[in-house]
A protein has these predicted regions:
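Long all-alpha helical scaffold domains
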Residues: 147-285
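N-terminal chloroplast transit peptides
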Residues: 1-44
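Charged low-complexity interaction tracts in eukaryotic proteins
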Residues: 57, 112-159, 202-241, 341-369
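General structural concept
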Residues: 78-132
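Short amphipathic alpha-helical interaction segments
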Residues: 107-118, 189-200, 329-339
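Positively charged, polyanion-binding regions of nucleic-acid-associated proteins
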Residues: 72-90, 155-173, 285-311
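Short acidic, hydrophobic short linear motifs in intrinsically disordered regions
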Residues: 79-80, 88-103, 136, 172-187, ...
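C-terminal structured domains
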Residues: 264-300, 305-395
Length: 395
């Protein structure tokens, strides 16, 4: 009984509420915290997507290389439509059908194809067919231009054949699927009918093989090795300007500060590591251990020679990746090229970059040596941007 009375006394002696200022503010001070309005909050910077993040930033950005990619985008519809229409019967297409081919023709999804067609009145025209449907095709002026392009293809056939031979000589098994050559034909200036018209004319150079273990894929195989072709652009340049080639690439040796090397000593040390380079036509190159220095030299040489064989001395990521098996390339090709800024310039975004051979371009951003096909393309682009033919243009 005394225990119960004692417990009751203790309970009554405690206050129901603690009105101590200290305890009150320590337990319920949340109302004093002022909420910062959203517009004044420091925004966390979002990580930029590789799809939009540019490879180069100031001061390394070279505007004339970046502008070339803008030109590619500007004439995307023209180039894709030209290639697609050229393969159609009578080189015409019904407008209703064209509206469903945004990927093949290169116009934005959800947009009217007619709007893109009307941008190039000297190149493309629409007309109402006897079926009362609107069709479009090339203008008579464009037909004449295409005949000129065919002449270029015939005149340069020998050079294009040598380009393909060199690509085959660089490849690991001296074989390249015909589909890959076709997908990249514009890169090297190969005609549309290269497989069916050109290849059969050169049985002493090429052989078409059906690879059963690869779903019957048709592959172009090298018949004979030609030592006169197995000379890279770098090797030719070395004979003209040895010092320039020595400076083209850099494979630095890691060393501690204890060596106390000055700039000249470090340059000489790095040169020992950089030279000799490995020829892209080395038959042992594809067999090198992937992660050795010699293998990286070989892959850098492969990319350099690959670009030197292209019309514009440049290639997009999808062009290079398509040949990764043939040229023993790794997933680190992007990082490898970034390490060689003296020779290569990577333009565009991290997801869709284009690599240029810097020495092939002048300070004005123009190719120093232009292939006739490149000259034709530039003329076509000028006509494509005209609304009517100007007098004396092109004379």
């Amino acid at each position: 009984m005394s225990v119960l009375l004692l417990h009751r006394h203790r309970m009554l002696s405690k206050p129901l509420y603690n009105f101590s200022p200290e305890s009150h503010f320590s337990s319920s001070s949340s109302f004093l915290i002022t909420k910062i309005p959203k517009k004044f909050k420091k925004k966390r910077k979002k990580k930029e997507s590789p799809r939009t993040k540019h490879v180069q930033t100031q001061p390394n950005l070279v505007s004339h290389f970046e502008n070339i990619l803008l030109t590619d985008n500007h004439f995307r519809f023209l180039n894709k439509t030209k290639n697609y229409l050229s393969k159609q019967p009578l080189q015409v297409l019904r407008l209703d059908d064209a509206g469903k081919l945004h990927q093949q023709l290169g116009f934005p999804r959800g947009r009217k194809v007619l709007k893109s067609i009307l941008r190039h009145p000297l190149i493309l025209q629409t007309y109402r067919h006897s079926d009362n449907k609107i069709w479009f095709g090339f203008t008579d002026f464009m037909d004449a231009l295409l005949r000129n392009e065919q002449t270029i293809h015939h005149e340069l056939e020998g050079q294009r054949v040598d380009v393909v031979r060199k690509l085959l000589m660089m490849s690991a098994n001296k074989r390249i699927p015909l589909s890959k050559l076709y997908h990249n034909r514009l890169l090297f200036g190969l005609p549309e009918d290269f497989r069916d018209r050109v290849v059969p004319k050169y049985p002493h150079y090429f052989k078409v093989v059906d690879v059963e273990e690869d779903d019957g894929k048709r592959v172009l195989e090298l018949v004979n090795w030609d030592h006169s072709l197995a000379v890279s652009a770098l090797e030719k340049e070395f004979l003209v300007d040895e010092d320039k080639v020595k400076r083209a690439f850099k494979f630095p040796i890691k060393h501690g500060n204890a060596l106390e090397l000055d700039m000249e000593d470090e340059r000489k040390l790095n040169m020992l590591n950089t030279l000799p380079l490995v020829s892209p036509y080395s038959e042992e190159g594809s067999k090198l251990d992937l992660w050795t220095l010699e293998a990286e030299k070989y892959r850098v040489g492969i990319i350099h020679e690959f670009l030197s064989l292209t019309l514009e001395k440049r290639a997009y990521i999808h062009n290079i990746v398509e040949f990764k098996e043939e040229f023993s390339l790794t997933k680190h090709t992007y990082q490898m090229l970034l390490k060689q800024p003296r020779t290569f310039y990577l333009a565009g975004t991290e997801m869709n970059w284009c690599v240029f051979l810097k020495d092939a371009y002048g300070e004005d951003g123009q190719l120093i040596n232009k292939d006739p096909q490149v000259v034709f393309n530039e003329k076509l682009y000028k006509y494509a941007d005209m609304q009517h033919l100007e007098s004396n243009f092109g004379e």
